[in-house]
Amino acid sequence: MNSDLLSRIKDRNKGRLQIVLLTRLDIFLNAGLSNAGSKISDNSAFLNWSFISEKDYPKTDLFLLVNNMFNSASKDNKEQSAWDNYFGFKIKRGQKDFDSFVYFLRLTTSKPRDFVKLLKIAKEQCQADYIENPTAEIIESDLFQRAYSTYFAESLRTALGFYYDREQIKLLFDFIKFIKLRRFTYQQYQNVWINFYEKNALEEIFGNEFEVLELLFNFNLVAVIEDDSYYRWKYRECTIANYDYSLQKNDLTPDTKFVFHWATEKEFGLYLK
């Protein structure tokens, strides 16, 4: 359109109109374009929010972006971490304490819009409590956790809505709630599948038990736990060269461990066990 249509507009000396496509990496790479990887490298502005290690988060583009949001609103506008001016505290989860940014990272899928939502919820909670800045107690509260879990579930519903209708998505959500375990093995998952009261309907729409598990993985609902310490998430493993990364059935054993995303716990009742 830019070359065939807009380039023919008269009086272009008054300004130039161009259309810029904004899209997700997975959608672009699955659009059937030739040399899609080269188009991203040579003809695109690729916004990559991925990171390798949580402990190195101060060096990531995602942290710099979020931190700059605070710096822009700060009167000092210094290079010093503005994040710490508002969230310079540890957040407890179970028996562990987390740096606030790492805690937020684990609630998200490393997307800026997730952080915007988290900050909006924190602001609303501060206003409700008549305090200026957030506290660890606000972030740890059931109100905060439930509000973000609802947002996460609605985002998932929207993404699934491109492929399934409302009743089909509800059936999938019912199955997730039926699991009732935040951490589970492949064997436990298979047992849940066998006992699910709508198994036949679920299988007719979404495929067999592995295909449903693969769907949960591809939509960042679950991760594979390796060596009890490394969490293999789809959004972290997916790259331009490996954009179709997914579960491999032959790699799974009955003892393969999975974990649901933190943000699913409240909405799907997975925090119960």
Language model features: what each stretch is:
Residues M1-K92:
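The catalytic "switch" region of P-loop NTPases
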Residues Q95-K273:
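C-terminal leucine-rich, beta-strand-based interaction scaffolds used for sensing/assembly
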